[in-house]
Amino acid sequence: MKRLIIILITTLLVSNITAQDPNRFFPKEDLILSGTYYYPEHWPRSQWERDIKKIAELGFEFTHFGEFAWSAMEPEEGKYDFEWLDEAVRLAAKYKLKVIMCTPTPTPPAWLTTKYPDILIKNENGLIVQHGARQQASWASDIYCEYVSKIVTQLAKRYGNNPVVWGWQIDNEPSHYTFAYDYSDNAQKKFRQWLKNKYKTIDSLNEIWGNEFWSQTYNNFEQILIPNQKELAGTANPHAMLDFKRYTADEAASFINFQNDILRQYASANQWITTNVRPRTASVDPARMDHLDFLSYTRYLVNGRHKGYGEQGFRISDVDPIGFSNDFIRNIKGITGVMEIQPGQVNWGRFNPQTYPGAVRLWHYHVFAGGNKFVCHYRFRQPLKGSEQYHYGTLQTDGVSVSNTGKEIVQFNKEINDLRKEYNPNSKLPVHLAKVKTAILRSSDNIWEMDFQPQTDQWNTMTHLIKYYNTLKTFGVPTDIVREDVDFSVYPVLVAPAYQLLDKELIARWTKYVNNGGHLVLTCRTGQKDRNAALWEEKLAEPIYDLIGAEELYFDHLPTDKWSIVNFNGNSYKWNNWADVITPKGNTNVWAKYEDQFYKGQVAVLNRKIGKGTVTYIGVDTDDGKLEKDVLKRIYNQVGETYDLPAGVLIEWRDGFYVGLNYTSEPQTFPINDATDKILLGTKVTEPAGVVIWKSKK
């Protein structure tokens, strides 16, 4: 109740305040600003000025304070201490550094969790998550939110009109990390209320959830428990599970929006507000955090999770961790920045290798190439104590010597300053790129639903989506990851990978898009269910039959040790993950067929002209993506000019600059024309983890 009152009061106070246009905070001629995290509370005060001065000397333009400092800001309940933070801000101003100020809400102090242990989250095994790390408090706790309101209000009043404070970061990486979902009593209570608000009556919920199945029918909302697969003898109700994931994403967004609204009451209009999301955190949907001025993100790349390309790929990473994040988060509010990026070797990965020489600089240029307005390096000094002792910083453990990877960041800072002199405010996306600009349609609902009901152990929705993204990047096409609320018509090509949950209104929009000249690509699983994750009371995926010009007969999977063949253009491709078996009708063109199994000769890929455009349906999912790449290449040959780049080689364009990035383990030659192009940085033949930047002389 207290939280509800706080939110209602806040809503009334900020009812006339909306998210600001973030572009005004970032002059285009700056290209990208570079900053670093600094934790004054970790170091003797006698070292602060030395450290902050060095931040400026190394070419950083802003610093970042406070996201884990609640116990330093409020050491005892109601006793606030900002004097130390005032001094840090004063020193930043002295050395002409901007400051990103943070709310410290991911780390509630011990006095709070001891006094109110019921604010802590509970995991799916019933374990209460203890004090001692971060993100252990429940967003659904009214008591927790009451204390959040108090500390955020104090910060906002103190720094909301301080000209040194450039902007605000709310919380840090909103999530519960390995404890992705909260099963606490607080969450249970809020989930029931969320369901009441959505369905109004228990009869409506029973109908949508299909609760006649297994006698799950409820008499009232109080009987409903959070669906917990660990506590069930059979598979959880998929409709209940989908709603729980929607609720969790709404709760996370509410927590961020709630803090945003408090800050906005007191913050100057010259200060922006954001949070830093982890783009692939399944329990959070960044688009729901719609009160913010913009979203930023966190990215770590070398930690044993990414194979990369070639012998040294594990030290450089894949192209998609930064690339996909750029193109996804940027399109939520029109801009983005990287609030936290890996500085070198870390401490928490599956294994923690040294990064390849140049890799950290490469990542910073990938951030730049993706249109980001700033990049913030985590962290300036390597900690001597605590859980991240072996986490690199710009400086080594002596606090004065620049680390090997820190030197790469300092180099980037200098080079960006030089690159600003080449900025042309009149630059526009070249025509050959505009003709092939592409959108990939992404839906949190689809990811949640299919990953709960994958149908085969080999299925992963994000892996499927990323495969298409990485393929498009080998063509060098400008790519946006978008939601359904965008104008499809601005994109010559629209790809909707495995878009299983949809409605007939979306199908009508797709049809209009194609009729007007767009090129639509749909893939396996698309159209099988409605928005509530119910199968249509029609043939399998029948609502899309008229659009794709075919009927889907059934789908198939194979064991992991067996492979079957698809033939496309006389070439054979292996698959064993997913196969939609389809029968074309009318004037539909057959592009690929299955070569074996009992459905030998049936169709795997088809293409159809409608009006001025085309629709292509790729019904098979391969592991290596070679079939999908060749099919997409055939489509783009009809649309415009593209590159043919090796996997791990990127060409991006921003603000008049072509940026070539080599994520591979071998030297790569970029298609730079000596007669018409001018190299600004690097060389045409680029070493592993190397960068080349050029612009057209025209």
Residue ranges and their predicted role:
Residues 42-57, 148-154, 277-288, 356-364, ...:
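Short, acidic/polar
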Residues 19-62, 75, 90-94, 98, ...:
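N-terminal carbohydrate-binding accessory modules
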Residues 129-324:
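Polysaccharide-binding and catalytic clefts of secreted carbohydrate-active enzymes
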Residues 221-224, 269, 300-301, 309-698:
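Carbohydrate-binding surfaces of carbohydrate-active enzymes
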Residues 4-13:
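Sec-dependent N-terminal signal peptides
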Residues 49-129, 153-156, 259-267, 500-501:
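Aromatic-lined substrate-binding rim segments of carbohydrate-active enzymes
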Residues 26-31, 56, 64-67, 73-78, ...:
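Aromatic- and acidic-residue-enriched carbohydrate-binding clefts of CAZyme catalytic domains
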Residues 33-45, 66-83, 130-149, 174-180, ...:
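The substrate-binding groove and active-site-proximal loops of carbohydrate-active enzymes
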